[in-house]
Amino acid sequence: MAALLRRLLQRERPSAASGRPVGRREANLGTDAGVAVRVRFAPSPTGFLHLGGLRTALYNYIFAKKYQGSFILRLEDTDQTRVVPGAAENIEDMLEWAGIPPDESPRRGGPAGPYQQSQRLELYAQATEALLKTGAAYPCFCSPQRLELLKKEALRNHQTPRYDNRCRNMSQEQVAQKLAKDPKPAIRFRLEQVVPAFQDLVYGWNRHEVASVEGDPVIMKSDGFPTYHLACVVDDHHMGISHVLRGSEWLVSTAKHLLLYQALGWQPPHFAHLPLLLNRDGSKLSKRQGDVFLEHFAADGFLPDSLLDIITNCGSGFAENQMGRTLPELITQFNLTQVTCHSALLDLEKLPEFNRLHLQRLVSNESQRRQLVGKLQVLVEEAFGCQLQNRDVLNPVYVERILLLRQGHICRLQDLVSPVYSYLWTRPAVGRAQLDAISEKVDVIAKRVLGLLERSSMSLTQDMLNGELKKLSEGLEGTKYSNVMKLLRMALSGQQQGPPVAEMMLALGPKEVRERIQKVVSS
């Protein structure tokens, strides 16, 4: 870079940047036939993937798939001091877990790689050289100390800090003298006063006069790493990105990016800036909130589809809000023109209900139910382990029966290994005294239930059991039907509340019900 700067000193610098001007575009999605739709999700690996990032990735994914396009993961890791170990792997892992894997990525590779900015430095250097040659960029020799003083002075005067463009109009002699002392200066981009208007697919026509509110930005740091503004423009161009769907916080920077496209003579992509995802109270969804990271939700048993559902249901882009949408339905129903400018308010208290709906859908599907059976077996082993008196509870037939009976009643698979459902896997410690406190007719009730099981153990249904249990309580003077149910619930589960007794009996099966009742009565 220093050698290039010296060569440029031998030539006359043009007074204005060259490049093809960016014209006004028609207000359409740019998805006409023959257009190769390519979008990118470009997070910085400065932290693990959280809900805000997932939403941006999802909108890119469903837009790409709706138009038979490609979804690219690019890691913007040029600020090496802030890179968090394991974050890059976590981001791609969580995208795959969520069911929205990239078509091209650091892990998967692809024709436009590498997909980490730290491995694309030569491209940024080439773009910087091109900008220096046309005079659209210039070296800056200002020290960090001077820049800090500028910032403090502006704040002291209640002004917005900005660079004063001190190095913008240095003479060739001045540049040569500075290069002799500092051969690796930062490179700044010369902001133009005339900024092209652009049609944002969400916010409409925009124009931000950046030169009037900020100084010329650094595009290449002295360490040879680019800043975000240059890197994203260079990468989007070389990767053939057709549409940039990103957070609305980048809307004001788009004019700067368009000036870079113009100076480099490149055609810019279509831009769509997505409104922010906020907490229900309107506060910012912060990475500092540990429970917004995807790995937290995965560990807690929330399904990917429920997260995709809730983060789209709270925002816009669809004709109506609707709980329970699957990923294929999201792709089919998504309409970028229906994304509004209003922030999306996320109410995570509703997530269990979203998860309940999606879990119920999985249970009702035979092949997916088999996968849930395997996962629940693992959960039971982990939760109870050596406490299992009877390992028959791990039998797939038994586990599947539990899932079918409790579908629609549980929000997470983990709920089935909570203390409330421990009776399904281990026998409760219930003494005779606990039953006597409920009714004096313990032996009579037990005898009738055992007789019922003997007569009809092969044809038990919940409706039949409900009817038989009501008949069973008839003729028991001083004992109400409700007390009979309390007694049986206590004998079977050791709990005073829970699912209907008839369902408990169906879940446990005639053999286990018989053994539990006999054990308690004889204790």
UniProtKB/Swiss-Prot annotation:
Annotated source species: Homo sapiens
A GO MF term: ATP binding
Disease the record associates with this protein: Combined oxidative phosphorylation deficiency 12: An autosomal recessive, mitochondrial, neurologic disorder characterized by onset in infancy of hypotonia and delayed psychomotor development, or early developmental regression, associated with T2-weighted hyperintensities in the deep cerebral white matter, brainstem, and cerebellar white matter. Serum lactate is increased due to a defect in mitochondrial respiration.
NCBIfam families: gltX_bact
Pfam families reported for this sequence: Anticodon_2, tRNA-synt_1c
Function: Non-discriminating glutamyl-tRNA synthetase that catalyzes aminoacylation of both mitochondrial tRNA(Glu) and tRNA(Gln) and participates in RNA aminoacylation for mitochondrial protein translation. Attachs glutamate to tRNA(Glu) or tRNA(Gln) in a two-step reaction: glutamate is first activated by ATP to form Glu-AMP and then transferred to the acceptor end of tRNA(Glu) or tRNA(Gln). In vitro, cytoplasmic tRNA(Gln) is slightly glutamylated, but with low activity.
HAMAP family for this protein: Glu_tRNA_synth_type1 (MF_00022)
Keywords: Acetylation, Aminoacyl-tRNA synthetase, ATP-binding, Disease variant, Ligase, Mitochondrion, Nucleotide-binding, Primary mitochondrial disease, Protein biosynthesis, RNA-binding, Transit peptide
One Gene Ontology biological process: glutamyl-tRNA aminoacylation
Family to which the UniProt record says this protein belongs: Belongs to the class-I aminoacyl-tRNA synthetase family. Glutamate--tRNA ligase type 1 subfamily.
Residues recorded as bearing N6-succinyllysine in the entry: K256
CDD domains cross-referenced by the UniProt entry: GluRS_core
Name used for this protein in its record: Nondiscriminating glutamyl-tRNA synthetase EARS2, mitochondrial
Positions of short motif 'HIGH' region: 45-53
Renumbered ranges of motif 'KMSKS' region: 284-288
EC identifiers of the protein: 6.1.1.24, 6.1.1.17
Gene Ontology CC, one term: mitochondrial matrix
Name of the gene encoding the protein in the UniProt record: EARS2
